[in-house]
Amino acid sequence: MTIYLTELSPETLTFPSPFTALDDPNGLLAFGGDLRPERIWAAYQQGIFPWYGPEDPILWWSPSPRAVFDPTRFQPAKSVKKFQRKHQYRVSVNHATSQVIEQCALTRPADQRWLNDSMRHAYGELAKQGRCHSVEVWQGEQLVGGLYGISVGQLFCGESMFSLATNASKIALWYFCDHFSRHQGQLIDCQVMNPHLQSLGATTLSREQFIQSLLSFKEKQVLSGCFETQWLATPTSPCAFED
């Protein structure tokens, strides 16, 4: 089967409409261009993100349905709450963004590492611009879990998460949802639904619903301090928002 895709020009940051994305493979929109931070930022502003395998050109996607979390309604499993009360992982924001991005790459098999050197560099540059943020989970002084993504107003576009210890990524998501919602964050984009996200309570929006939400939230700002470097949990206050 022949498919026709737009090739992005390296000279401009223009993308085709997300509504022209293919149904099969779901959401494939364009190829080419580059990974300049400006291009990636322009993509997220339109509900588009890069993802490609080791042997692929740069591919750009806008799938439907879209996996999302409503941070105001997120509820961790009781077992995760009990685990955190016992083990008291520390949780932070923007303490080790480059390390989180690196671990998100390294914890996957080599043939599945879409977070190549170019992608890691691009998100690192976006972090320097204050657009890419991370949540870290620590066991003592060791980084054992976390997530990172791009903030677009009151929408957070989650890119990847990792876990090197029991429940670490679940705790990262739990604390971030609470923190983000307290700062007027409205929606967390998880891109494509999978069994793990579904087990954590993710739901889906159609492309039309997601783009409508994006347009509504991207011009509204979260409260000041949301993405300042800070601690969300320490051994003296590991569960500040118990039932």
UniProtKB/Swiss-Prot annotation:
Xref: HAMAP family: Leu_Phe_trans
Keyword Cytoplasm: yes
This protein's name: Leucyl/phenylalanyl-tRNA--protein transferase
Catalysed reaction, written as an equation: N-terminal L-lysyl-[protein] + L-leucyl-tRNA(Leu) = N-terminal L-leucyl-L-lysyl-[protein] + tRNA(Leu) + H(+); N-terminal L-arginyl-[protein] + L-leucyl-tRNA(Leu) = N-terminal L-leucyl-L-arginyl-[protein] + tRNA(Leu) + H(+); L-phenylalanyl-tRNA(Phe) + an N-terminal L-alpha-aminoacyl-[protein] = an N-terminal L-phenylalanyl-L-alpha-aminoacyl-[protein] + tRNA(Phe)
Organism: Vibrio cholerae serotype O1 (strain ATCC 39541 / Classical Ogawa 395 / O395)
Function of the protein: Functions in the N-end rule pathway of protein degradation where it conjugates Leu, Phe and, less efficiently, Met from aminoacyl-tRNAs to the N-termini of proteins containing an N-terminal arginine or lysine.
A cellular component term, taken from the record's GO annotations: cytoplasm
One Pfam family matching this protein: Leu_Phe_trans
Xref: SUPFAM superfamilies: Acyl-CoA N-acyltransferases (Nat) (SSF55729)
Enzyme Commission numbers on file: 2.3.2.6
Keywords: Acyltransferase, Cytoplasm, Transferase
UniProt lineage: Bacteria, Pseudomonadati, Pseudomonadota, Gammaproteobacteria, Vibrionales
Molecular function per GO: leucyl-tRNA--protein transferase activity
Predominant location: cytoplasm
Database matches in NCBIfam families: aat
